[in-house]
Regions:
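A short acidic, Gly/Pro-enriched loop at the edge of an enzyme's catalytic core
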Residues: 11-21
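A C-terminal cap/extension of S-adenosyl-L-methionine-dependent methyltransferases
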Residues: 105, 115-176
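Acceptor-substrate binding/catalytic loop of class I
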Residues: 63, 85-102
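Conserved class I S-adenosyl-L-methionine
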Residues: 50-80
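Conserved SAM-binding strand-loop segment of SAM-dependent methyltransferases
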Residues: 1-9
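A short SAM/SAH-binding and catalytic strip from SAM-dependent methyltransferases
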Residues: 19-34
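A short glycine-rich, Lys/Arg-flanked "PGG" loop and its adjoining helix->strand segment in the class I
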Residues: 35-50
């Protein structure tokens, strides 16, 4: 069964448990109440259930490079505690940037980390791919370098996106 509802309303799901919960690219960045959302996730999972959360962390090398064009608003927007205005397909909303450490801290009592991967540390983000249109070899090399480095600290926790995969602890693991 697939259900779609706002993150803040996860408490409405009381009758089911799931094997896997997935948050699409940056979806969790749209709530200012992420700690409340994260607290609800373990209760929605079966034992050994997994989550895959894709967030936009506060550190994005490509956005920080805007400092060289003196565009400080873009270069540091992810560091704002009150979030930053964002727009997708002419819809404006507030986006909040959370660190992988924050998410893990809120979930670790109930969950184990399985994998982390940073995306777009070396490879430019999608909105900059037009610079690589006529450079397929460079694009391929950047993609491979990004995939490799994204699996190693500190690149696991930074980038345009960060993927965090966790598994719900078993009853035995809680007793340890």
């Amino acid at each position: 069964e697939v259900r779609q509802l706002p993150f803040e309303n996860l408490y409405q799901i009381k009758d089911k448990k799931y094997d896997f919960i997935f948050s699409n690219f940056g979806g969790l960045n749209c709530t200012s109440q992420l700690n409340n959302v994260l607290k609800q996730l373990p209760a929605l999972l079966n034992e050994n259930g997994k989550i895959m959360l894709v967030i936009m962390p506060p550190v994005s090398i490509w956005e920080h490079l805007h400092i060289f064009s003196l565009n400080f608003k873009v270069a540091f927007r992810r560091w704002r505690k009150d979030g930053a205005e964002a727009s997708v397909e002419n819809v404006t909303f507030r986006s909040y940037y959370y660190s992988a450490k924050y998410i893990i801290k809120n979930l670790q009592p109930e969950m184990n980390i399985l994998h982390m991967q940073g995306l777009c540390n070396i490879m430019p983000p999608e909105f900059m791919h037009h610079y690589l249109t006529n450079k397929p070899k460079l694009r391929k090399w950047l993609g491979k370098a990004d995939s490799f480095l994204g699996g190693y600290f500190p690149f696991t926790q930074i980038g345009d996106y960060c993927i965090i995969v966790m598994r719900k602890k078993t009853c035995n693991e809680h007793q340890l």
